């Protein structure tokens, strides 16, 4: 698949896969920034893109940032729809007790291209019964003593 990329910032880098087997490609910051402890920051990537119809870009947390710095993409995965043409930006949450410093060119998230499907919604009077029923949060986890 070919994805058209428009650089709108002089520090923008074209995304690339780090290995042949990588499903995600790196997204790089175009500006220096500091995200304070227990705070959220919006990080510019400096690119716009054009995806084929039927695909989305998912913006995901880099595992190293999560493990080593407790920094994650807040709305992970963030969704970039195929008809969006604005700048890609990443919402990062710093869950740590330390400042998180971002330098120009830092890999701050990863992108994964995914196929999308359109559902047809059909209103009905009642849904089929299942063994789970309406059991929600935690209902299939640890048993209650």
UniProtKB/Swiss-Prot annotation:
A molecular-function term among this protein's GO annotations: dUTP diphosphatase activity
GO biological process, alphabetically ordered: dUMP biosynthetic process; dUTP catabolic process
Keyword Transport: no
Cofactor: Mg(2+)
InterPro entries noted in UniProt: dUTPase, dUTPase-like, dUTPase-like_sf, dUTPase_trimeric
UniProt keyword Magnesium, yes or no: yes
Binding site residues for substrate: 62-64, 75, 79-81, 89
Associated pathway: Pyrimidine metabolism; dUMP biosynthesis; dUMP from dCTP (dUTP route): step 2/2
EC number: 3.6.1.23
Keywords: Hydrolase, Magnesium, Metal-binding, Nucleotide metabolism
Catalysis: reaction(s): dUTP + H2O = dUMP + diphosphate + H(+)
Superkingdom in the source lineage: Bacteria
Role of this protein: This enzyme is involved in nucleotide metabolism: it produces dUMP, the immediate precursor of thymidine nucleotides and it decreases the intracellular concentration of dUTP so that uracil cannot be incorporated into DNA.
PANTHER family: DEOXYURIDINE 5'-TRIPHOSPHATE NUCLEOTIDOHYDROLASE (PTHR11241:SF0)
Family: Belongs to the dUTPase family.
Name by which UniProt lists this protein: Deoxyuridine 5'-triphosphate nucleotidohydrolase
